[in-house]
Amino acid sequence: ASQQGETMSGPLHIGLIPTVGPYLLPHIIPMLHQTFPKLEMYLHEAQTHQLLAQLDSGKLDCVILALVKESEAFIEVPLFDEPMLLAIYEDHPWANRECVLMADLAGEKLLMLEDGHCLRDQAMGFCFEAGADEDTHFRATSLETLRNMVAAGSGITLLPALAVPPERKRDGVVYLPCIKPEPCRTIGLVYRPGSPLRSRYEQLAEAIRARMDGHFDKVLKQAV
């Protein structure tokens, strides 16, 4: 028990990507502070390639991100699968639907994040498979910019479920679950191979996994 206490005390530098950090942290920070009161958490936000470089150099202890090919060089601990929902403006022809078939996106142009965001690449993959394309007139710097562009009637987009509000419709945006297939990304905790603090990261991952268990079932039910 004393060893566990030592493992979960002291400073911990955690990196998070911008499309995860602001949306996941409110769910987990109070729980982590209560569960591991002696842990001093320092949070760093950057894009995937920057975080992995800082993890490799030792500037960061661990990183929470959407698992990608580049993270395979590290120890990956999957936390949860996060669905993506279609965000459309409130007077869009699909606004009263309960869900959207991915095949329905064929021929549509979707708003996307700018280069460097892994969510951009993942969303583009799902869109291309469905026969959709990118709206090349605009690339957003953040999910909030994307959301506001949708509210303004400038287009539609895929948003990760953590960024979706509890209501199916809010501030001029309607959120619809996508099916056949359901687009999603795997969020994981990543750390350096051979790290002496492996136990710390595994305990952290287990606590986050338990906290988020079943969370997206509720989100998708509310969206319908």
What are these regions (language model features)?
Residues 9-72, 140-142:
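Central regulatory/effector-binding core of bacterial HTH transcription factors
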Residues 71-84, 88-110:
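Flexible hinge/capping segments at coil-to-helix
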Residues 11-15, 63, 87, 111, ...:
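Short, well-ordered beta-strand segments
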Residues 4-6, 33, 75-78, 94, ...:
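Short secondary-structure boundary/capping segments
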Residues 94, 109-130, 197-206, 211-221:
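Secondary-structure junction motif
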Residues 1-5, 204:
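Alpha-helical linker/hinge and terminal dimerization helices associated
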Residues 161-170, 180-224:
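C-terminal effector-binding regulatory domain of bacterial HTH transcription factors
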Residues 47-60, 65-66, 114-174:
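Hydrophobic hinge/microswitch elements
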